[in-house]
Amino acid sequence: MIPPRSLGSTAALLLVLLFTTLASAIKFDLPSNAHPHTKCIWNYALSDSLVIVTASVVAKEPFDFSHQRVDIEVVDGSQHNNVYLSKKAIKGETRLAINTHSHADLGVCFKNTLTSKSGNQIPVVTIDLDVDIGADAVDYNAIANQESLSGLETEMRKLEAVANEIVNEMEYLKKRELRMADTNLSTNMRVTNFAILTLIALIALGVWQVFHLRGFFKRKYLID
């Protein structure tokens, strides 16, 4: 019989994994413009993570795509500013797959360009975006069919992948914390050294002032 405490811990872990595996989905309208601004949807992703981007682009009635062009670009916010994919004139459902190179925010960016005017109205598209990262991007149904896994085994395989992602993220956070601690230590040492040098300089200046004034007073015969 499993102890109640173990059951509680297992349930808590499963709840954490469940909420961690939620995919990012959003739906929004994007009006066209001759000089369009770029709208980006950002999600954090670890390095070497599989990311599946599914974008459904539909022109809002009464417009079509004859007067507007939607471009998509997948980038990240790392210091390298990686551009993973760039595709122009997308319509309908577009599915993109990438592998990340850095621990950074991953941006899926859209731009709707007005190619020609259509009366006084501005053409608009509706974008339904779904971003799956890591374990959520893996097709476990295909794996289950290939390896003849049961439903429970498939779920356990998925939870195992999510748990590995959590471990990797915790390791990354630990390394980042160590780097920040090293930076703080280095900064504190520099501040301490600067304070010591400043104190030594003030003492040296004070000693010099004493000898200078002593010599001045002797020349003026104010002291012996």
Curated annotation (Swiss-Prot):
Keywords: Endoplasmic reticulum, ER-Golgi transport, Golgi apparatus, Membrane, Protein transport, Signal, Transmembrane, Transmembrane helix, Transport. It is found in: Endoplasmic reticulum membrane; Golgi apparatus membrane. Pfam families: EMP24_GP25L. The keyword Glycoprotein does not apply. It is a single-pass type I membrane protein. Disulfide bonds: none annotated. One of its GO terms (cellular component) is endoplasmic reticulum membrane. Belongs to the EMP24/GP25L family. This is Endoplasmic reticulum vesicle protein 25. It comes from Mycosarcoma maydis. The gene is ERV25.
